[in-house]
């Protein structure tokens, strides 16, 4: 997979020293079909609309 985003080189979270090395996954054939990914930050632990829909214990890191 070749990223077509003109700002890809600035997205350190994908490919930089501290990134997830997405290009390595893409080179190995992982492209994300059939996967749902969410990044959820602070502020959800006591949000009334989300309390009933949490599927993991607080503080759990999926990665």
From Swiss-Prot:
One of its GO terms (molecular function) is serine-type endopeptidase activity. Gene3D superfamilies: Peptidase S8/S53 domain (3.40.50.200). InterPro entries: Peptidase_S8/S53_dom_sf, Peptidase_S8_Asp-AS. One of its GO terms (biological process) is proteolysis. Heterodimer of a large and a small chain. PROSITE patterns: SUBTILASE, SUBTILASE_ASP. Belongs to the peptidase S8 family. Keywords: Hydrolase, Protease, Secreted, Serine protease. It comes from Achromobacter lyticus. It is found in: Secreted. This is Protease 2 small chain. Residues 11-63 form the Peptidase S8 domain. Its EC number is 3.4.21.-. One of its GO terms (cellular component) is extracellular region. It comes from the Bacteria.
């Amino acid at each position: 997979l070749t990223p077509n985003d003109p700002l890809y080189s600035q997205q350190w979270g994908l490919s930089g020293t501290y990134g997830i090395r997405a290009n390595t996954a893409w080179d190995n054939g992982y492209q994300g079909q059939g996967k749902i990914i969410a990044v959820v930050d602070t502020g959800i632990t006591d949000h009334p609309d989300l309390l009933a829909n949490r599927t993991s214990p607080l503080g759990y890191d999926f990665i």
